[in-house]
Protein backbone atom coordinates (compact mmCIF):
# COMPACT_ATOMS: atom_id res chain seq x y z
CA UNK A 1 0.00 0.00 0.00
CA UNK A 2 1.11 3.56 -0.66
CA UNK A 3 1.40 6.32 1.83
CA UNK A 4 -1.24 9.01 1.96
CA UNK A 5 -1.09 12.77 1.91
CA UNK A 6 -3.71 14.61 3.91
CA UNK A 7 -4.76 17.71 5.78
CA UNK A 8 -4.35 18.34 9.50
CA UNK A 9 -5.95 21.04 11.62
CA UNK A 10 -5.54 22.30 15.16
CA UNK A 11 -7.94 20.46 17.46
CA UNK A 12 -8.98 20.16 20.86
CA UNK A 13 -5.80 16.26 15.37
CA UNK A 14 5.78 3.16 13.70
CA UNK A 15 5.23 2.07 10.72
CA UNK A 16 7.68 -0.06 8.84
CA UNK A 17 9.03 0.51 5.36
CA UNK A 18 8.75 -2.33 2.88
CA UNK A 19 10.60 -2.29 -0.41
CA UNK A 20 8.86 -2.70 -3.74
CA UNK A 21 11.57 -4.33 -5.80
CA UNK A 22 14.28 -1.78 -6.48
CA UNK A 23 12.07 1.02 -7.71
CA UNK A 24 11.25 2.45 -4.30
CA UNK A 25 9.36 1.73 -1.12
CA UNK A 26 5.75 1.87 -0.09
CA UNK A 27 4.74 2.58 3.47
CA UNK A 28 2.80 0.12 5.57
CA UNK A 29 2.26 -0.34 9.26
CA UNK A 30 -0.13 -1.44 11.94
CA UNK A 31 0.49 1.12 14.65
CA UNK A 32 -1.77 4.00 15.64
CA UNK A 33 -0.16 6.44 13.22
CA UNK A 34 -1.07 4.21 10.30
CA UNK A 35 -4.58 3.21 11.34
CA UNK A 36 -5.77 6.58 12.63
CA UNK A 37 -4.02 9.00 10.30
CA UNK A 38 -3.01 7.25 7.08
CA UNK A 39 -5.71 4.67 6.38
CA UNK A 40 -8.13 6.72 4.30
CA UNK A 41 -9.66 7.22 0.88
CA UNK A 42 -9.25 10.61 -0.84
CA UNK A 43 -12.45 12.61 -0.54
CA UNK A 44 -14.07 10.23 1.94
CA UNK A 45 -16.20 12.11 4.44
CA UNK A 46 -16.37 15.31 2.38
CA UNK A 47 -19.45 17.40 3.11
CA UNK A 48 -21.33 20.32 1.61
CA UNK A 49 -20.42 23.34 3.73
CA UNK A 50 -22.99 25.77 2.35
CA UNK A 51 -25.41 25.16 5.22
CA UNK A 52 -22.79 25.26 7.97
CA UNK A 53 -22.61 28.12 10.43
CA UNK A 54 -19.87 30.63 9.63
CA UNK A 55 -16.78 30.68 11.84
CA UNK A 56 -16.35 33.83 13.92
CA UNK A 57 -12.60 34.01 13.25
CA UNK A 58 -12.06 35.39 9.76
CA UNK A 59 -8.27 36.00 9.73
CA UNK A 60 -6.44 32.68 9.48
CA UNK A 61 -2.99 31.39 8.55
CA UNK A 62 -2.36 28.17 6.64
CA UNK A 63 1.04 26.49 6.90
CA UNK A 64 2.99 25.09 3.94
CA UNK A 65 6.30 23.22 3.92
CA UNK A 66 9.32 24.95 2.40
CA UNK A 67 10.50 23.27 -0.78
CA UNK A 68 7.34 21.18 -1.21
CA UNK A 69 5.51 22.51 -4.27
CA UNK A 70 2.34 20.53 -3.64
CA UNK A 71 2.18 21.93 -0.11
CA UNK A 72 1.96 25.51 -1.37
CA UNK A 73 -0.35 24.47 -4.23
CA UNK A 74 -2.91 22.82 -1.94
CA UNK A 75 -2.62 25.65 0.58
CA UNK A 76 -3.32 28.04 -2.29
CA UNK A 77 -6.44 26.10 -3.25
CA UNK A 78 -7.68 26.30 0.34
CA UNK A 79 -6.92 30.02 0.42
CA UNK A 80 -8.93 30.57 -2.76
CA UNK A 81 -11.93 28.63 -1.43
CA UNK A 82 -11.89 30.25 2.00
CA UNK A 83 -11.51 33.78 0.66
CA UNK A 84 -14.67 33.27 -1.39
CA UNK A 85 -16.39 32.64 1.95
CA UNK A 86 -15.12 35.90 3.39
CA UNK A 87 -11.94 34.77 5.14
CA UNK A 88 -8.65 36.65 5.04
CA UNK A 89 -6.01 33.97 4.51
CA UNK A 90 -2.24 34.11 4.83
CA UNK A 91 0.03 31.25 3.73
CA UNK A 92 3.24 30.91 5.74
CA UNK A 93 6.17 28.64 4.90
CA UNK A 94 7.83 26.35 7.46
CA UNK A 95 10.16 23.39 7.64
CA UNK A 96 8.16 20.35 8.75
CA UNK A 97 9.04 20.34 12.47
CA UNK A 98 8.33 24.04 13.08
CA UNK A 99 5.19 23.72 10.95
CA UNK A 100 3.68 21.07 13.20
CA UNK A 101 4.79 22.97 16.30
CA UNK A 102 3.18 26.12 14.91
CA UNK A 103 -0.05 24.25 14.27
CA UNK A 104 -0.44 23.00 17.83
CA UNK A 105 0.62 26.40 19.20
CA UNK A 106 -2.20 28.05 17.27
CA UNK A 107 0.09 30.15 15.05
CA UNK A 108 -1.49 28.45 12.04
CA UNK A 109 -4.82 26.67 11.79
CA UNK A 110 -4.24 24.19 8.96
CA UNK A 111 -1.59 22.08 7.24
CA UNK A 112 -2.59 20.48 3.94
CA UNK A 113 0.41 18.21 3.48
CA UNK A 114 0.87 15.53 6.14
CA UNK A 115 2.80 12.55 4.71
CA UNK A 116 1.92 9.37 6.59
CA UNK A 117 2.49 6.84 7.99
CA UNK A 118 6.28 7.26 7.73
CA UNK A 119 7.55 10.71 6.76
CA UNK A 120 5.71 12.74 9.41
CA UNK A 121 5.02 9.91 11.87
CA UNK A 122 7.18 11.35 14.66
CA UNK A 123 5.38 14.70 14.51
CA UNK A 124 1.96 13.03 14.64
CA UNK A 125 3.03 10.84 17.55
CA UNK A 126 4.21 13.95 19.39
CA UNK A 127 1.31 16.29 18.60
CA UNK A 128 -1.51 13.98 17.47
CA UNK A 129 -3.78 14.52 20.47
CA UNK A 130 -3.84 18.23 19.67
CA UNK A 131 -4.64 17.88 15.97
CA UNK A 132 -7.64 16.84 13.94
CA UNK A 133 -7.39 14.62 10.87
CA UNK A 134 -9.36 16.21 8.00
CA UNK A 135 -8.80 13.32 5.60
CA UNK A 136 -6.46 12.71 2.68
CA UNK A 137 -6.35 13.98 -0.88
CA UNK A 138 -3.78 11.59 -2.41
CA UNK A 139 -3.08 7.92 -1.77
CA UNK A 140 -0.35 6.84 -4.17
CA UNK A 141 2.74 8.66 -2.93
CA UNK A 142 6.05 6.78 -2.71
CA UNK A 143 9.31 7.20 -0.81
CA UNK A 144 12.16 6.87 -3.29
CA UNK A 145 15.79 7.45 -4.10
CA UNK A 146 16.02 9.50 -7.28
CA UNK A 147 18.81 10.21 -9.77
CA UNK A 148 18.94 12.55 -12.74
CA UNK A 149 17.40 10.91 -15.79
CA UNK A 150 20.52 10.97 -17.95
CA UNK A 151 22.72 9.22 -15.36
CA UNK A 152 23.61 5.53 -15.45
CA UNK A 153 21.79 4.06 -12.44
CA UNK A 154 18.43 2.48 -13.21
CA UNK A 155 17.68 0.83 -9.86
CA UNK A 156 18.46 1.66 -6.24
CA UNK A 157 20.74 -1.37 -6.17
CA UNK A 158 22.89 0.12 -8.95
CA UNK A 159 24.10 2.78 -6.52
CA UNK A 160 26.01 0.11 -4.59
CA UNK A 161 28.54 -0.21 -7.42
CA UNK A 162 28.05 3.16 -9.12
CA UNK A 163 28.64 5.42 -6.12
CA UNK A 164 31.61 7.11 -7.80
CA UNK A 165 29.26 8.41 -10.50
CA UNK A 166 27.35 10.31 -7.79
CA UNK A 167 30.30 11.62 -5.77
CA UNK A 168 29.59 8.79 -3.29
CA UNK A 169 26.86 10.98 -1.79
CA UNK A 170 23.14 10.57 -1.17
CA UNK A 171 21.45 13.88 -0.38
CA UNK A 172 18.65 13.83 2.18
CA UNK A 173 16.20 16.18 3.88
CA UNK A 174 15.51 17.06 7.53
CA UNK A 175 17.03 14.97 10.32
CA UNK A 176 13.63 14.60 12.03
CA UNK A 177 11.77 13.37 8.94
CA UNK A 178 10.53 9.80 8.84
CA UNK A 179 11.97 9.62 5.32
CA UNK A 180 15.43 10.25 6.78
CA UNK A 181 14.98 7.54 9.41
CA UNK A 182 13.69 5.08 6.80
CA UNK A 183 16.73 5.81 4.65
CA UNK A 184 19.20 5.15 7.48
CA UNK A 185 17.39 2.17 9.01
CA UNK A 186 15.96 0.49 5.91
CA UNK A 187 17.08 1.63 2.46
CA UNK A 188 20.83 1.95 3.11
CA UNK A 189 21.30 -1.48 4.74
CA UNK A 190 18.82 -3.21 2.43
CA UNK A 191 20.52 -2.07 -0.77
CA UNK A 192 24.09 -2.07 0.57
CA UNK A 193 24.61 1.69 0.27
CA UNK A 194 26.92 2.18 3.25
CA UNK A 195 29.58 3.36 0.80
CA UNK A 196 27.52 6.52 0.23
CA UNK A 197 27.75 9.56 2.48
CA UNK A 198 24.14 10.20 3.49
CA UNK A 199 24.09 13.98 3.71
CA UNK A 200 21.23 15.16 5.94
CA UNK A 201 20.21 18.81 5.61
CA UNK A 202 16.78 20.22 4.75
CA UNK A 203 14.35 20.06 1.85
CA UNK A 204 15.34 23.53 0.52
CA UNK A 205 19.05 22.66 0.84
CA UNK A 206 18.58 19.34 -0.94
CA UNK A 207 16.67 21.06 -3.74
CA UNK A 208 19.37 23.71 -4.04
CA UNK A 209 22.01 20.98 -4.40
CA UNK A 210 19.84 19.18 -6.95
CA UNK A 211 19.58 22.34 -9.04
CA UNK A 212 23.31 23.07 -8.67
CA UNK A 213 24.39 19.57 -9.71
CA UNK A 214 22.04 19.22 -12.66
CA UNK A 215 22.87 22.72 -13.92
CA UNK A 216 26.56 21.78 -13.84
CA UNK A 217 25.89 18.53 -15.69
CA UNK A 218 26.83 16.43 -12.66
CA UNK A 219 25.05 13.25 -11.61
CA UNK A 220 23.24 13.34 -8.26
CA UNK A 221 21.36 10.88 -6.05
CA UNK A 222 18.84 12.25 -3.58
CA UNK A 223 16.12 10.98 -1.26
CA UNK A 224 12.81 11.93 -2.77
CA UNK A 225 9.06 11.48 -2.49
CA UNK A 226 7.04 10.58 -5.55
CA UNK A 227 3.93 12.72 -5.55
CA UNK A 228 5.76 15.95 -4.79
CA UNK A 229 6.64 18.67 -7.26
CA UNK A 230 10.35 18.06 -6.62
CA UNK A 231 10.24 14.84 -8.63
Question: PLM features: residue spans?
Answer:
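Sec-dependent bacterial lipoprotein signal peptides
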Residues: 1-11
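Bacterial lipoprotein signal-peptidase II cleavage site
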Residues: 10-30, 40
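Short, well-ordered beta-strand elements
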Residues: 31, 37-40, 55-70, 87-92, ...
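Extracytoplasmic small-molecule ligand-binding "clamshell" domains
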Residues: 60-63, 68-113
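Pocket-flanking alpha-helical
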Residues: 75, 95-129, 205-213, 229-231
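Ligand-binding cleft/hinge of the Venus flytrap
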Residues: 78-85, 163-196
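Ligand-binding pocket segment of bilobal, Venus flytrap-like solute-binding proteins
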Residues: 108-112, 182-231
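A conserved helix-loop-strand patch within extracytoplasmic ligand-binding domains
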Residues: 129-176
